[in-house]
Amino acid sequence: MKNWKTSAESILTTGPVVPVIVVKKLEHAVPMAKALVAGGVRVLEVTLRTECAVDAIRAIAKEVPEAIVGAGTVLNPQQLAEVTEAGAQFAISPGLTEPLLKAATEGTIPLIPGISTVSELMLGMDYGLKEFKFFPAEANGGVKALQAIAGPFSQVRFCPTGGISPANYRDYLALKSVLCIGGSWLVPADALEAGDYDRITKLAREAVEGAKL
């Protein structure tokens, strides 16, 4: 972690909403990122769920410098190295393994690993991490479960993801332990396919404004 160019905390506090993005066509990446930034959302999680995901990260990092682009669904050290080379400024994983944690502590970008149990949280803390993704948030008991897990660990902060929606994201943001939330509703697949970037900007702006209430 001593080689990290920035901290996980500084990235997550830039939130409060981090879009969880699936880019199916490379040509969508840059205009989508610009649309989100125009709506006030700068931290973008591009998931490694499609063949063009790494190239999308590379394009956004190069052409939309005002965005803080990271990689989601990072599963192993090889993927961590690949997204780092592509220009990702952070990495998010759905869970944690010791090889991935070791690679992250020796790497140059922050890893925000997913946890759903206290034991997983403590393993991550053993590697010096303090920021985690709580995933899948709603399926694991939602706000009440996160409150209970966070209780003994006052120094730890979270980005809950999974089942987060406009109807419940403010409930998570109200928790002291939560720095931001991750949500897929900001970049609907049909809006991307139609090239409706104004809709993406509108959704981003509504999410940012709603977080202030």
UniProtKB/Swiss-Prot annotation:
Changing S184L: 4-fold decrease in catalytic efficiency with KDPG as substrate. Increases the efficiency for retro-aldol cleavage of both KDG and KHO. It catalyses: 2-dehydro-3-deoxy-6-phospho-D-gluconate = D-glyceraldehyde 3-phosphate + pyruvate; (4S)-4-hydroxy-2-oxoglutarate = glyoxylate + pyruvate; oxaloacetate + H(+) = pyruvate + CO2. Pyruvate binds at R49, T73, K133. This is KHG/KDPG aldolase. Disruption phenotype: Cells lacking this gene show no detectable KHG aldolase activity. Belongs to the KHG/KDPG aldolase family. One of its GO terms (molecular function) is 2-dehydro-3-deoxy-phosphogluconate aldolase activity. SUPFAM superfamilies: Aldolase. Transmembrane segments: none annotated. It is found in: Cytoplasm. Keywords: Carbohydrate metabolism, Cytoplasm, Lyase, Schiff base. Homotrimer. The active site is at E45 (proton acceptor), K133 (schiff-base intermediate with substrate). One of its GO terms (cellular component) is cytosol. Changing T161A: 13-fold decrease in catalytic efficiency with KDPG as substrate and 250-fold increase in catalytic efficiency with KDPGal as substrate. PANTHER family: 2-DEHYDRO-3-DEOXY-6-PHOSPHOGALACTONATE ALDOLASE-RELATED, 2-KETO-3-DEOXY-6-PHOSPHOGLUCONATE ALDOLASE. Pathway: Carbohydrate acid metabolism; 2-dehydro-3-deoxy-D-gluconate degradation; D-glyceraldehyde 3-phosphate and pyruvate from 2-dehydro-3-deoxy-D-gluconate: step 2/2; Carbohydrate metabolism; glyoxylate and dicarboxylate metabolism. Optimum pH is 8.6 for KHG aldolase activity. Optimum pH is 8.4 for KHG aldolase activity. The lineage of its organism: Bacteria, Pseudomonadati, Pseudomonadota, Gammaproteobacteria, Enterobacterales. GO terms for biological process: Entner-Doudoroff pathway through 6-phosphogluconate. It is an enzyme of class 4 (lyase). Induction: Part of the edd-eda operon, whose expression is controlled by three functional promoters (P1, P2 and P4), each of which is responsible for induction under different growth conditions. Both P2 and P4 are responsible for the high basal level of expression. P1 controls induction on gluconate and is regulated by GntR. P2 is induced by growth on glucuronate, galacturonate and methyl-beta-D-glucuronide, and is mediated directly by KdgR. P4 is active under conditions of phosphate starvation and is directly controlled by PhoB.
